[in-house]
Amino acid sequence: MATSASSHLNKGIKQMYMSLPQGEKVQAMYIWVDGTGEGLRCKTRTLDCEPKCVEELPEWNFDGSSTFQSEGSNSDMYLSPVAMFRDPFRKEPNKLVFCEVFKYNRKPAETNLRHSCKRIMDMVSNQHPWFGMEQEYTLMGTDGHPFGWPSNGFPGPQGPYYCGVGADKAYGRDIVEAHYRACLYAGVKITGTNAEVMPAQWEFQIGPCEGIRMGDHLWVARFILHRVCEDFGVIATFDPKPIPGNWNGAGCHTNFSTKAMREENGLKYIEEAIDKLSKRHQYHIRAYDPKGGLDNARRLTGFHETSNINDFSAGVANRGASIRIPRTVGQEKRGYFEDRRPSANCDPYAVTEAIVRTCLLNETGNEPFQYKN
């Protein structure tokens, strides 16, 4: 399996420099979503002192013509800090800074989906929407070959790998453990991890997060994963169907509840929300991957624990349905439901906004409603 040249550099030499004192200065790594709607970019600046909150962080700029976000003739774009985390790579007092992107005219960039999501979340803040997202991903060599797979063939059939233990079942656990600890250090709300059904496929869970924070924490968790994989010389892909054939795809199952759903007899509100979702299936399919449903078409086949992309379905404990009500929720008659349709490479802001629009703002039809200021 091919690994990156950088992973073969002597890390001990790097550590000699990283252990040097930095005085009162702080390194802040600014992170943003690029013009693909999937890729992340970052760059670092020096601050004179440690910021205590995100409001103390300065705005910055970058060359949007090199990130698929603007033309070269008018390429300056703005980075507006919206979330701050501890930096697990440089350690305290250094920071990771997640940013929204704005164009030269101060309008949000096309892939800045956080801007509209924040507005929608503010409209329903009194209902306290909680989200939890289950991020699946696949580890690959730099040659695009799945990590740990035979160079001239395939591993044994699916079955022993889900939550598997042992060198012949768990491929890449060191990366998973490093990512988990780095997220905890950063302050990302990571709640668990497990090996998935396909070998070299893993999952981590983020949440519960209220409102806009769901997207903030998931994007930063993805960034940390990419950086950890960079150190190990491998790639983490969020492609929803990285290997064709009889192998599971990768999703980002999204769990959702409101205060009313979590309280006694909340199942009534869960069922009402599912009924609303059933009448707006195609709108959600378009929102649930960056290519308007084309990526998910490779994954949502009705096989490998997925629903069919053309049909809406719901059921208790049914992993072949669009919407799953966990068995414990059915028994306790309160809790949350799981939307199993979002793809692994979805934008969490698009997913959570769509759910709120349909379930809480009672929107119908195939287009989002345009609210006045």
Curated annotation (Swiss-Prot):
| InterPro entries xrefs | Gln_synt_N, Gln_synt_N_sf, Gln_synth/guanido_kin_cat_dom, Gln_synth_cat_dom, Gln_synth_gly_rich_site, Gln_synth_N_conserv_site, Glutamine_Synthetase
Q: Which residues does ATP bind?
A: 134, 203-208, 255-257, 319, 324
| GO molecular function terms listed in the Swiss-Prot or TrEMBL record | ATP binding; glutamine synthetase activity; metal ion binding; protein-cysteine S-palmitoyltransferase activity
The membrane-topology field of this record reads: Lipid-anchor
One BP term from GO = intracellular ammonium homeostasis
N6-acetyllysine: modified positions: 11, 14
Quick one: where's region Required for glutamine-induced ubiquitination by CRL4(CRBN) and proteasomal degradation? 2-25
- N-acetylalanine is found on 2
Name of protein:
Glutamine synthetase
Residues annotated as binding ADP are 336-338
- Record entry for activity regulation: Glutamine synthetase activity is inhibited by methionine sulfoximine (MSO).
Q: What is its EC number?
A: 6.3.1.2, 2.3.1.225
The role this protein plays is:
Glutamine synthetase that catalyzes the ATP-dependent conversion of glutamate and ammonia to glutamine. Its role depends on tissue localization: in the brain, it regulates the levels of toxic ammonia and converts neurotoxic glutamate to harmless glutamine, whereas in the liver, it is one of the enzymes responsible for the removal of ammonia.
Q: Which residues form the GS beta-grasp domain?
A: 24-106
Organism expressing this protein natively = Acomys cahirinus
Q: Which family does it belong to?
A: Belongs to the glutamine synthetase family.
Q: What does the PTM comment of the record read?
A: Palmitoylated; undergoes autopalmitoylation.
Which keywords label this protein?
Acetylation, Angiogenesis, ATP-binding, Cell membrane, Cytoplasm, Endoplasmic reticulum, Ligase, Lipoprotein, Magnesium, Manganese, Membrane, Metal-binding, Microsome, Mitochondrion, Nucleotide-binding, Palmitate, Phosphoprotein, Transferase, Ubl conjugation
Residue numbers binding Mn(2+) 2: 136, 196, 203
Ranges for domain GS catalytic come to: 113-373
Q: Which reaction does it catalyse?
A: L-glutamate + NH4(+) + ATP = L-glutamine + ADP + phosphate + H(+); L-cysteinyl-[protein] + hexadecanoyl-CoA = S-hexadecanoyl-L-cysteinyl-[protein] + CoA
Q: Where does Mn(2+) 1 bind?
A: 134, 253, 338
Phosphoserine occurs at: 343
Q: Which positions bind L-glutamate?
A: 246-247, 319, 340
Instruction: List residues modified as Phosphotyrosine.
Output: 104
Q: Where is the signal peptide?
A: none
